[in-house]
């Protein structure tokens, strides 16, 4: 149970966060336990975590702010072990280094700074930037469909995630369909070229080429019916003039 001072301090800090949200960070206490806080860090630009969504917890001692919280990250991220206490200067691993003036925002900014660096500590892991980017892309899906605590703590954010995931899936399907059409067209062109190369008789090859050209011209005509009609009208006019002059000559 939180002490009166801890309750008062954490309530004040939550109000400050609501009124002045820090960049890349969302944080809120559990409605049934003010000592249990949940945070969401959005991966900053120009880092392997860009647009990733990382959920974790801060577990405060009852005598906060005189002692630091335990820090954990739940979402797979490639930097820290999931659901493992992290050894940081602002965590309960180092109470001797703790400053009571530090706040929730100070702690989470420090966590974000450490996360985007390369320093190792207890609870950290080593992975490639490629792995971190892959996990960043999967993070919203994990939080939305596999992270029970996230769903309970951040229902509005979960709904937003669902819309983002559906939109990305639709764009991916559209892109995949366009790529398949392009591949199909390239395959068809390759097959035509191959079939021409297989024809040994020059005259037969010329005839096939003419057929392919005729087919292409027909498609072009179908695409431009207005232009086609104008050409036919012009030809009819020229033919009529020619017949008129032939009639004059014959007289």
UniProtKB/Swiss-Prot annotation:
Task: Cite the SMART domains for this sequence.
Answer: UBCc (SM00212)
Top EC class for this record = transferase
GO-annotated molecular function: ATP binding; ubiquitin conjugating enzyme activity
Q: Hey, which stretches end up on the Cytoplasmic side?
A: 1-229
Q: Which family does it belong to?
A: Belongs to the ubiquitin-conjugating enzyme family.
User: Locations of Basic and acidic residues compositional bias?
Assistant: 173-185
Q: Which reaction does it catalyse?
A: S-ubiquitinyl-[E1 ubiquitin-activating enzyme]-L-cysteine + [E2 ubiquitin-conjugating enzyme]-L-cysteine = [E1 ubiquitin-activating enzyme]-L-cysteine + S-ubiquitinyl-[E2 ubiquitin-conjugating enzyme]-L-cysteine
Q: Does the keyword Transmembrane helix apply?
A: yes
Q: Which residues cross the membrane?
A: 230-250
Q: Does the keyword Endoplasmic reticulum apply?
A: yes
The name on file for this protein is Ubiquitin-conjugating enzyme E2 6
Q: Which UniProt keywords apply?
A: ATP-binding, Endoplasmic reticulum, Membrane, Nucleotide-binding, Transferase, Transmembrane, Transmembrane helix, Ubl conjugation pathway
Output the InterPro entries linked to this UniProt entry: Ub_conjugating_enzyme, UBQ-conjugat_E2_core, UBQ-conjugating_enzyme/RWD
The record's section on Gene3D superfamilies has: Ubiquitin Conjugating Enzyme
């Amino acid at each position: 149970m939180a002490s009166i001072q801890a309750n008062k301090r954490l309530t004040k800090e939550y109000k400050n966060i609501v009124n002045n949200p820090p960049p890349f960070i969302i944080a809120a206490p559990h409605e049934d336990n003010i000592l249990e806080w949940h945070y969401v860090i959005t991966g900053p630009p120009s880092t392997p975590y860009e647009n990733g969504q990382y959920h974790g917890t801060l577990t405060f001692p009852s005598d906060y702010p005189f002692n630091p919280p335990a820090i954990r990250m739940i979402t797979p991220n490639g930097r820290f072990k999931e659901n493992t206490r992290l050894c940081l200067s602002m965590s309960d691993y180092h109470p001797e280094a703790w400053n009571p003036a530090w706040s929730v925002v100070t702690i989470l900014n420090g966590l974000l700074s450490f996360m985007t660096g390369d320093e190792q500590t207890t609870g950290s892991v080593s992975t490639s930037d490629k792995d971190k980017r892959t996990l960043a892309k999967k993070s919203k899906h994990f939080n939305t469909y596999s992270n029970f605590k996230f769903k309970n703590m951040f229902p509005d954010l979960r709904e937003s995630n669902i819309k983002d995931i559906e939109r990305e899936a639709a764009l991916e399907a559209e892109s995949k369909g366009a790529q398949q059409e392009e591949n199909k067209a390239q395959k068809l062109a390759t097959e035509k070229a191959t079939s021409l190369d297989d024809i040994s008789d020059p005259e037969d090859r010329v005839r096939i080429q003419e057929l392919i050209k005729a087919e292409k011209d027909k498609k072009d005509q179908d695409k431009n019916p207005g232009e086609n009609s104008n050409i036919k009208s012009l030809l009819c006019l020229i033919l009529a003039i020619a017949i008129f002059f032939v009639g004059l000559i014959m007289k």
